[in-house]
A protein has these predicted regions:
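Domain-level signature for soluble enzymes in the chorismate/prephenate branch of the shikimate pathway
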Residues: 1-97
Length: 97
């Protein structure tokens, strides 16, 4: 194997490790969403909080900008995470019988 191919294999291994960590973090975020649902239910709060969502998007877009990440990546990524969080929280809501 050439040096370039070994370098490519190492870089792919780094991608694989990063991807695994991203998935672990998404799973952790979903676990927090489930706990958040319990708190919101106990306190009679709505699952969807547009003001909090807007503040979070502004924060992550600013963070992304500082990291030289394009907004075209950051915003859709976090909109997807927010939608998933809301879905997870709604799944925790007791069903009416």
């Amino acid at each position: 194997m050439s040096e370039q191919r070994e370098g490519l294999a190492e870089l792919r291994a780094r991608f694989d490790a990063i991807d695994s960590e991203l998935l672990r973090l998404v799973a952790a975020r979903r676990a927090v969403s489930r706990r958040m649902a319990a708190v919101k239910l106990a306190e009679g709060l709505p699952f969807h909080d547009p003001a909090r969502e807007a503040a979070l998007l502004a924060r992550v877009q600013a963070d992304g900008s500082r990291l030289n990440l394009p907004d075209a990546l950051v915003k859709p990524l976090f909109l997807l995470l927010l939608a998933d969080s809301l879905q997870v929280q709604r799944q925790e809501e007791p069903t009416a019988t």
